[in-house]
Amino acid sequence: MPLRLIKKKRLCRFNPASFLTTGDQIAGTSDWPKLNMTANPEASKHTEKANMAVPHHVAITMDGNGRWAESRGLDVSEGHHAGFENLQRIVADFANRGVAYLTLFAFSTENWDRPESEVNGILELAIAVIAHEAEQLNENGVRIKHLGRVDRLSPELREELELAVKKTENNTGLTLAIAFDYGGRAEIMNAAKELIAEGTPLEEIDESKFAEHLYTADMPDVDLLIRTGGDFRISNFLLWQTAYSELYFSEIMWPDFYGEHVDLAFESFNERKRRFGKRI
């Protein structure tokens, strides 16, 4: 029976137990596989495949859930369900590849303007997934972070996020940052406001000091930014942290972005010459 998580009228049916799919539904897994606990915090790790370097910090704009569903004659909510299932695949895959930080753009500050039924469905689904998955992520050594505002989240979602962050704060495996009610411009503006409120002398403000007031204060800059779904834009995501990121855009919709599509993204990353503004 679907779990009732929000007292108001339900707008999205979801059984959280179904998120832990079988090996037939998610290729090669049954529940959560044992994740790699040895992500190198100092440098990129190399995979066995062609001695491929793995980016230290990967950020993903998970786009295309709605179009994936519509192309199959399904309700948009089913696309979001499929997208969350792929999240499980990707987290396990990236951890096992040696990625140290994975940031997922789950819900933007602008997404509140979508139809109310879709927004409520996403919020309810997020509550169910976080509530049901946090323990297994914790057992696998994953550290969960939340990037974004909390004041507009429902009490249920805020509580689940805070519990997940607290439960996993001392883990040393993959850091999974969930950008929910996140906007890059708002993040930068809030950092500036905090510095002003603290009375920080102007001469003490530099890039390092400013970065301490971002949501990602204890995280490195993004090495590889992936966007699925066929659009070629950043969409207000990690504007500060992607200053020198490599960008990879895929036409594949998010629910189908795994396996060989991840291989292609990492292969593309390995073909880049990262100069960081210098002449090499």
Say what each PLM segment does.
Residues 8-9, 26:
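Polybasic, lysine-rich low-complexity intrinsically disordered segments
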Residues 2-5, 19-20, 31-280:
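Flexible, compositionally biased loop and terminal segments
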